[in-house]
UniProtKB/Swiss-Prot annotation:
A single GO BP: translation
Segment forming the signal sequence: none
Ranges for region Disordered: 1-22
Name the record gives this protein: Large ribosomal subunit protein bL27
């Protein structure tokens, strides 16, 4: 009888969906309030001035301005938003 016996199935072939983490706005880029600057797990980047820290450690802008990254003496990188200077009228 020319029958082919059923082959076993692989138990591999799955992967989790990517989480799209990382820097979304780089140094010098303009942001408005509410823009996400960094998506991260844990605090690889720390919040500086004019930014908020979400419960999932997302850093987001609280004011409009330009993104600034600073490394302090403790080795931590702080993310801030420098407000745009108001135009003199």
């Amino acid at each position: 009888m020319a029958h082919k016996k059923a082959g076993g199935s692989s138990r591999n072939g799955r992967d989790s969906e990517s989480k799209r983490l990382g820097v979304k706005k780089f140094g010098g880029e303009a942001v408005i309030a509410g823009n996400i600057i960094v998506r991260q797990r844990g605090t690889q980047w720390h919040p500086g001035s004019n930014v908020g820290l979400g419960k999932d450690h997302t850093i987001f802008a609280l004011t409009a301005g330009n993104v600034d990254y600073r490394t302090k003496a403790n080795g931590r990188v702080y993310v801030s938003v420098m407000p745009k200077a108001e135009a003199a009228e």
